[in-house]
From Swiss-Prot:
Membrane topology, record value: Single-pass type II membrane protein
Glycan-carrying positions: N71, N107
Protein name: Beta-1,3-galactosyl-O-glycosyl-glycoprotein beta-1,6-N-acetylglucosaminyltransferase
Disulfide bonds: C72-C229, C163-C383, C184-C211, C392-C424
Compartments reported by the entry: Host Golgi apparatus membrane
Length: 439
């Protein structure tokens, strides 16, 4: 009788344990269904994309963490201890990673899916607002393949369209590596016409014009065109760019100011091009159509209608032809067209509408001769990196200031000078793209 009772109790215990296991299984199943998130098939239409759990999984798959020895959260907030540590870290040669080579990209792009996954490209639109507002890019490059790939990754979105112009003079392995990278994306292509780019000559403008023609012929209904070079990097997410471009309401944004007397000499004489650009004693005729000349820089944020008029409007084409033999025409062609009354999105030539590079959103640059004590009226503090052609190549100490500005991109970055600032910027932008919040 006692034995039978023990068996009954034992059987009851087993049933209780079995019931607990079944309950746990049901709860686990429900939780797994609730938190099911197939990152590989995640897209904008998926309900899962809106869940915090899926956002976390997506971020874990796509995050671009900087090396552990630097505190990017502190650097982006301007914490001086974190900045000093990053600058000291940058001085240690043994910690510097050699840049990825042309051969690396030629090998990894043999499997495009592996390349995009390993290099962590975002492969679907992150919002409907971004999907409905595609952006076009003209990317002019000539060296440093890793710089190009990291820039492309930072600005890449599948709804956008990207034209890449490679300098004809670039090494063949570099050109092949660029082709290999862009072959992995249906919305990235090589410009149909490539030119040899000579510093400060017309060829820099021609590279952008070639991309403009190709981009207008694409099937993507892009709204704005941004032009970039290999030392640029975005300081806004794609979503932030879309918002900023919408706020322009069809206007363009680029530097356009009255030229100094020294800059007027850039179009006073005819220039010749060999391997370099040199002036002649031949005086040029005045600008066509009595246009007042303005000066700016090579970078612009231009509406599609503006781009169309650059290529098709007879008055625009007369100015284009006139500036071809000037010095650094990219620094006065766009600035002058931005003040031409027939150009869509332009502004009047009146002094009230002069726009500095700090006011325009196209590009954030620190010029050496403007750096100084901000409390004494300087526009910005000294560069924490180094200078090249009087332009700051940013260091980690510049990042907090960079992120306080309204520009879409900044120039110049070079991982050989300071890779910490780029790593932190990549980590910051990727976190903000996925979560919409800062680090």
């Amino acid at each position: 009788m006692v034995g039978w009772k023990k068996k009954k109790l034992c059987r009851g215990h087993h049933l209780w344990v079995l019931g607990c296991y079944m309950l746990l299984a049901v709860v686990s199943l429900r939780l797994s269904l609730r938190f099911k998130c197939d990152v590989d098939s995640l897209d904008l239409e998926s309900r899962d994309f809106q869940s915090q759990h899926c956002r976390d999984m997506l971020y874990n798959n796509l995050k671009l963490p900087a090396k552990r020895s630097i505190n990017c959260s502190g650097i982006t907030r301007g914490d001086q201890e974190a900045v000093v540590q990053a600058l000291l870290d940058n001085l240690e040669v043994k910690k510097k990673r050699p840049p990825l080579t042309d051969t690396y990209y030629l090998n990894i792009t043999r499997d495009c899916e592996r390349f995009k996954a390993q290099r962590k490209f975002i492969q679907f639109p992150l919002s409907k607002e971004e999907l409905d507002f595609p952006i076009a890019y003209s990317m002019v490059v000539h060296e440093k393949i890793e710089n190009f790939e990291r820039l492309l990754r930072a600005v890449y979105a599948p709804q956008n369209i990207y034209c890449v112009h490679v300098d004809v003079k670039s090494p063949e392995t570099f050109k092949e590596a660029v082709k290999a990278i862009i072959s992995c994306f249906p919305n990235v292509f090589m410009a149909s016409k490539l030119v040899p780019v000579v510093y400060a000559s017309w060829s820099r403008v021609q590279a952008d014009l070639n991309c403009m023609e190709d981009l207008l012929q694409s099937s993507v209904s892009w709204k704005y065109l941004l032009n970039t070079c290999g030392t640029d990097f975005p300081i806004k997410t794609n979503a932030e760019m879309v918002l900023a471009l919408k706020m322009l309401k069809g206007k363009n944004s680029m530097e356009s100011e009255v030229p100094s007397e020294s800059k007027k000499n850039r179009w006073k004489y005819h220039y010749e091009v060999t391997d370099t650009l040199y002036p002649t004693s031949k005086m040029k005729d005045p600008p066509p159509d009595n246009l007042p000349m303005f000066t700016g820089n090579a970078y612009f944020v231009a509406s599609r209608a503006f781009v169309q008029h650059v290529l098709d409007n007879p008055k625009s084409q007369r100015l284009v032809e006139w500036v071809k033999d000037t010095y650094s025409p990219d620094e006065h062609l766009w600035a002058t067209l931005q003040r031409a009354p027939w150009m869509p999105g332009s502004v009047p030539s009146h002094p009230k509408y002069h726009i500095s590079d700090m006011t325009a959103v196209a590009r954030l640059v620190k010029w050496q001769y403007h750096e100084g004590d901000v409390s004494m009226g300087a526009p910005y503090a000294p560069c924490s990196g180094i200078h090249r052609r009087a332009i700051c190549i940013y260091g980690a100490g510049d990042l907090y200031w960079i992120l306080q500005n309204h520009h879409l991109l900044a120039n110049k970055f070079d991982p050989r000078v300071d890779d910490n600032v780029l790593q932190c910027l990549e980590e910051y932008l990727r976190h903000k793209a996925i979560y919409g919040t800062e680090l």
